[in-house]
Amino acid sequence: MKYKNLRDFLELLEKQGELKRITQEIDPYLEMTEIADRTLRAGGPALLFENPKGYEIPVLCNLFGTPKRVALGMGQEDVTALRDVGRLLAFLKEPEQPKSFKDLWSTLPQFKQVLNMPTKVLSKAECQQIVFSDAEVDLYKLPIMHCWKDDVAPLVTWGLTITKGPSKKRQNLGIYRQQLIGKNKLIMRWLSHRGGALDFQEWKEARPNQPFPISVALGADPATILGAVTPVPDTLSEYAFAGLLRGNKTEVVKSISNDLEIPASAEIILEGYIDPTETALEGPYGDHTGYYNEQEYFPVFTVTHLTMRKDPIYHSTYTGRPPDEPAVLGEALNEVFIPILQKQFPEIVDFYLPPEGCSYRLAVVTIKKQYAGHAKRVMMGVWSFLRQFMYTKFVIVCDDDINARDWKDVIWAITTRSDPARDCTIIENTPIDYLDFASPIAGLGSKMGIDATNKWIGETQREWGTPIKKAPNVVKRIDDIWESLNIFAPK
């Protein structure tokens, strides 16, 4: 990997024309979102706002605004190479015993990568060059973006929240949005199934009414950031996975106010605690669904220490109707999911999460069908195998002659190969995204699977249609004379 920290990565992006420095004064209130949104939709570069209105700290946006930059952040040259990352994760999830010396030799590179999994603990780090504590902490000095006009307050979006349950051996890294409500107060919005929330719940049960320690890193190196959003096995820490991606151990340092280990090269660190008795009403905010979410009470994060580099960069983003940065991340990580799914279900040919489906609410799967009812088995597998798909509402299964990434192909398969009564499977009372206001109950809704495969004996009693195919010899002859026909000659 060609970078060690965020600044190395920005230097790499700038050399490749993938970073634009904006020196003109731009307001974090709405203006940065508008510029970032237009840039992302045009496939443009990462943006470094060097002169944010009213602030001294520059703001970085659209860091992962294209699949290419996500791949670069994972140490790969292009998106297709992300399948290698998926194969590595599949191997780590279920390691296979070598069948021969040759087999052992071929897997040696994967075993060697494991040497980069342990963290390297430093005694001092750049993220603690400047320290503000207690009354000195003032979060209003950070250029926290106010993304949409009806958002209730500025929102921290790219913070890596670091937690540890009282009985767990490893830390958890998760990305949860945080509403600014005071000089040293943020609302920690995490859903109950997420790692940080589970750690907090375990803490409350083991140590009632005691403050729960938390550290939040802003501007960590891309491998660590992406490690927090990648489907790593439960037994593997995000720091360990970042070390695998980077090819070097993740450097960490102990927080000043607690025992949590934080990324040593991060730009800004927030340290503090959650009082189990303190909550606040969060939202509404414009979200990745394209709508404002409902308000709900969540824990309050009290910041006791704010540490940073001497010249920090504030890393931020916005979420809205796709495409946005989370949708781009989802599109790139789609390639990571495929080898993991294929190891469990070898019949899967392709798997696609369309960005228009909020990156996870709809999945299209193509398979090499082998028996009647096969499509339904794959549906159930998608919903149950990885926790990342527990909120996927729709799963469409097609044969391998269909391009999962071409809606024209998929719609043709649905309309010609499926019968609504026979081929639609609806499951009620399943976990659903809390932000999905279409569900009848918050957090609980239904799922639909559509079998758009050709039907086998046992699935239909009718003679099945034969697809039209062109005559190869005729296609070749017309190919040979096509240009001479001059059909599309300029007028």
Curated annotation (Swiss-Prot):
What EC identifiers does the entry list?
4.1.1.98
Residues where prenylated FMN binds: 175-177, 189-191, 194-195
Q: Where in the cell is it found?
A: Cell membrane
Task: Name the protein family.
Answer: Belongs to the UbiD family.
Known PANTHER family for this protein?
Answer: 3-OCTAPRENYL-4-HYDROXYBENZOATE CARBOXY-LYASE-RELATED, FERULIC ACID DECARBOXYLASE 1
Cite the binding residues for Mn(2+): 172, 238
Q: Which UniProt keywords apply?
A: Cell membrane, Decarboxylase, Flavoprotein, FMN, Lyase, Manganese, Membrane, Metal-binding, Ubiquinone biosynthesis
Question: What are the catalytic residues?
Answer: 287 (proton donor)
Necessary cofactors: prenylated FMN; Mn(2+)
Instruction: Tell me the function of this protein.
Output: Catalyzes the decarboxylation of 3-octaprenyl-4-hydroxy benzoate to 2-octaprenylphenol, an intermediate step in ubiquinone biosynthesis.
Question: By what name is this protein known?
Answer: 3-octaprenyl-4-hydroxybenzoate carboxy-lyase
Entries under InterPro entries matching the protein: UbiD, UbiD-like_C, UbiD-like_N, UbiD_bacteria, UbiD_Rift_dom
Keyword Cell division on this protein? no
Gene Ontology molecular-function annotations? 3-octaprenyl-4-hydroxybenzoate carboxy-lyase activity; metal ion binding
Coiled-coil portions: none
One Gene Ontology cellular component:
plasma membrane
Q: Which pathway does the UniProt entry assign to this protein?
A: Cofactor biosynthesis; ubiquinone biosynthesis
* UniProt source species: Histophilus somni (strain 129Pt) (Haemophilus somnus)
Q: Which GO terms describe its biological process?
A: ubiquinone biosynthetic process
Self-association state and partner proteins as the record states: Homohexamer.
- Catalytic reaction list: a 4-hydroxy-3-(all-trans-polyprenyl)benzoate + H(+) = a 2-(all-trans-polyprenyl)phenol + CO2
Q: Which cysteines are joined by disulfide bonds?
A: none
Note on how the cofactor is bound: Binds 1 prenylated FMN per subunit.
